[in-house]
């Protein structure tokens, strides 16, 4: 858990012990003498702490990497220090943007009815529809099968169905036309369905046609049907050179397939996967230890938990 103590607080803790004039947010940039030196001392102390050990638990984070068909190697994030190669998983890329509604309903276009469409902060964030519809277009591959998952809650226990439509235009039903009704009120209901794309652009439409109740959509998820999450096996670069590089370097797509292994590149700035990926819809999830950023503004905080902040000052 990251700390909450600001750079300004840390500086003033030191200045107070030295019986020096403390800074405020308005005087922070105009620091002088011992005040400026204290700024530098704190950053030096933080640097010493973070460089004493590479794998501090509070610097452990995760990221995702979109995969491109035929592309073998990828670079680590800018703040990367060391990767946990036991954490690399290959999954199907999530195609819906902001389908979790964590803080807003951005990326969704509403279709007016007699009611409204709005953001609800209930749960982890939801799209609230009351006699309103919302849709989003996603990129798809013609004739490719996809999984769609939708969770909805009925705030007034009215038993009103949510229309879920998938097609080549907003409210289109060429690929899927179904409803989702909540019967276990308070628990919600989940739709698990599949569809086959008939266009490179596919529209997902959610529609509550009644003002009798709010239908709260908790999440919408779409991914390719035939991609099963797989842990990537780590192999050393030496083993990659000795074992499979001859296959990957052949200028032919015949050997493109679902990647099974991951290796660290020789410069330690990235990773490679093998076999070469056969599609663009894969995504790699992995964890790594990041490098810290020096404190600079008054409101900057440490990655270090507050309980350990006295180590710095």
Model-derived features: where do they sit?
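Extracellular glycan-recognition surfaces and repeat-rich motifs
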Residues: 103-127, 253
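Extracellular beta-rich ligand/substrate-recognition surface
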Residues: 123-133, 184, 294
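Extra-cytoplasmic beta-strand recognition segments
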Residues: 101, 132-157, 191-195, 220-222
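Beta-strand acidic-aromatic groove motif in beta-rich domains, primarily in extracellular
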Residues: 157-168
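Glycine-enriched, solvent-exposed interface loops adjoining structured elements
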Residues: 1-99, 106, 178, 183-187, ...
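Extracellular carbohydrate recognition and processing domains
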Residues: 171-201
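Extracellular beta-strand ligand-recognition surfaces/modules
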Residues: 192-222
């Amino acid at each position: 858990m990251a700390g909450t103590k600001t750079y300004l607080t840390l500086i003033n803790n030191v200045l107070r012990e030295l019986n020096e004039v403390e800074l405020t947010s308005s005087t922070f940039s105009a620091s002088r003498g011992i005040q400026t030196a204290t700024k530098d001392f704190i950053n030096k102390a933080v640097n010493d702490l973070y460089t004493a050990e590479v794998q501090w638990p509070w610097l452990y984070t995760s990221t995702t990497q979109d995969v491109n068909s035929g592309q073998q190697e990828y670079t680590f994030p800018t703040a990367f220090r060391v990767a946990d190669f036991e954490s690399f998983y290959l999954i199907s890329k999530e195609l819906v943007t902001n389908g979790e509604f964590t803080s807003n309903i951005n990326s969704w276009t509403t279709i007016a009815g007699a009611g409204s469409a709005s953001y609800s902060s209930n749960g982890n964030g939801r799209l609230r529809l009351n006699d309103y519809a919302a849709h989003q277009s996603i990129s798809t591959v013609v004739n490719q099968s996809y999984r769609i998952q939708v969770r909805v809650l009925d705030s007034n226990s009215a038993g009103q169905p949510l229309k879920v439509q998938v097609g080549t235009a907003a409210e289109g039903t060429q690929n899927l036309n179904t409803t989702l009704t909540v019967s276990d009120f308070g628990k919600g209901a989940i739709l698990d369905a599949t569809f086959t794309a008939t266009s490179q652009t596919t529209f997902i439409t959610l529609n509550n046609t009644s003002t009798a109740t709010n239908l709260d959509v908790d999440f919408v998820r779409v991914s390719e049907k035939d991609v099963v999450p797989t842990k990537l096996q780590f192999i050393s670069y030496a083993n990659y050179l000795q074992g499979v590089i001859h296959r990957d370097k052949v200028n032919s797509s015949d050997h493109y397939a679902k990647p099974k292994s991951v290796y660290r590149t020789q410069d330690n700035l990235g990773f490679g996967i093998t076999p070469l990926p056969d599609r663009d819809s894969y995504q790699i999830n992995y964890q790594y230890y990041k490098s810290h950023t020096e404190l600079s503004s008054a409101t900057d905080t440490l990655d270090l938990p507050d309980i350990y902040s006295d180590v710095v000052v």
